[in-house]
Every structure is written in C-alpha cells, then in structure tokens.
UniProtKB/Swiss-Prot annotation:
Family: Belongs to the bacterial ribosomal protein bL33 family.
InterPro entries, A to Z: Ribosomal_bL33, Ribosomal_bL33_CS, Ribosomal_bL33_sf, Ribosomal_zn-bd
Name of the featured protein: Large ribosomal subunit protein bL33
HAMAP family, per database record: Ribosomal_bL33 (MF_00294)
Superkingdom classification of source: Bacteria
Organism per entry: Pelotomaculum thermopropionicum (strain DSM 13744 / JCM 10971 / SI)
Pfam families tied to this protein: Ribosomal_L33 (PF00471)
BP term (GO), one: translation
Length: 49
C-alpha cells in the first residue's frame, strides 16, 4: 500500500517535496538528501506527518 508523504528540510524546516512510499517496505520515516531552494544547498530532508 503506497501512501503520500511530505519531506521537510532539517535546516530551515520548510516542506519542499512530496513523494510516495510503500509502508510495508519502509515502516520507518524516510530520510533523503535533497536540494532545498530556500537554503540553496543539498540538505537532509525527513518525512513529516
């Protein structure tokens, strides 16, 4: 079952990306390095509720 999730920048706390994840394969929160246009650099983005 795929569900939509939002990724937030850990530096500025802005929610920049939306994506989907498979809850069966990834039961924990997702963490990805993505580009933040507000920080203007690649930062760690974490899944928000």
């Amino acid at each position: 079952m795929r569900v939509g999730v939002t990724l937030a920048c850990t530096e500025c706390k802005r929610r920049n990306y939306t994506t989907t994840k498979n809850k069966k394969n990834d039961p924990n929160r997702i963490e990805m390095k993505k580009y933040c246009r507000f920080c203007q650099t690649h930062t760690l983005h974490k899944e928000t509720r």
